[in-house]
Amino acid sequence: MPQLLPLRLRDVAGRRAAATAAAAATESDPEELEPIGVETQALPVFDSELERTGPLSIIAPRRIGESDLAVYPLSLGASVFGWTADGETSLRILDRFSHHGGNFIDTADSYVGGRSEVLIGKWMRERGNRDGTVVATKVGRHHENPGLGSVSIVRAVEASLERLQTDYIDLLYFHDDDPEVPLEDSLATVEWLIESGKVRYLAASNFSADRLIEARILSSTGLPKFIAVQTQYNLMHRSEFESALRIVASAQGLAVMPYYALANGFLTGKYRSKDDLNADARSIRAAAYVNRRGQRVLAALDRVAAEHESSPASIAIAWLLAKRNVVAPVASASRPEQVDALLAAAGIRLTRAQMLELDRVSE
């Protein structure tokens, strides 16, 4: 490991010791799978149907926190790439997403053992569109580089860069908090990665409000600060975010990136009764919502969707986009034709009455 990193970590340790002394003187997603072999054949020819169409609509980009990253307000979740969406299908999904204006892709080093990143890297190389694509990936869950220790972070980032076939990561998430590692050590490691040009910005996933506050205090010493937070948030799962986490995110100006935006597919209307459920992983997770509350939410989504001549999925994402600090919900597609409903959400403006109705039925 380059010498700059351990030197910086020693500086952090010194700051931590000084802070301790001062205080004493004054008396607070798909599970990881084994990697799958990578095909070597070229990408499928660009869909001729896409060549005859343009973007769905003109949508203003949104900025991610205090950064220069401007993104379409929908992040394409890549956890299904190489899993429920095979390699060729994944590439066609990416083509459709990009052609209709999408530029923000969310992945992780642990998704399908790194296969998701491999497919994204292959697509960017063949299409020559790396500069126009904002790539977010996460570290901390891959079985070869677990946790947020310095060595794990550096090795994980190097491996992601190789799979993505790029020199830099636009937005690096800590996939989960790691209570076994001092947060300042993890931040110092990312500082070195930023100085090296391998990472542009840092974000947090699945962090508590208290830990976000701690991280912001540490950033006052010159360490990198989080510019975004990713958390589970949708019409069926609200309380976790609509608490101290929302208050802290707003106070810190963090861009909020809700994952499971469609509640494992439930908010698309695919699972309306127990008869619609099957044995796949998404269906099993969605089963928790097949109840009276879920039926009320789907009925409201159907009504609002009819008023906008849209779909329940688009309305569910539009509801998120109307919430303060939400920049780009994360949603995935297992077929190319599903992409349109995801992107269409950014062009929908819900009325106050519609927002109140959706808020009420989902309480």
Predicted features along the sequence, with ranges:
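Short, acidic/polar
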Residues: 85-97, 148-163, 212-216
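Structural motif
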Residues: 100, 163-164, 197, 252
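Short acidic capping loops at alpha-helix termini that bridge into adjacent secondary structure
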Residues: 72-73, 106, 128-133, 167-171, ...
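Beta/alpha (TIM)-barrel catalytic core signal, keyed to glycine-rich beta->alpha loops juxtaposed to Asp/Glu
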Residues: 4-7, 11-12, 33-35, 49-54, ...
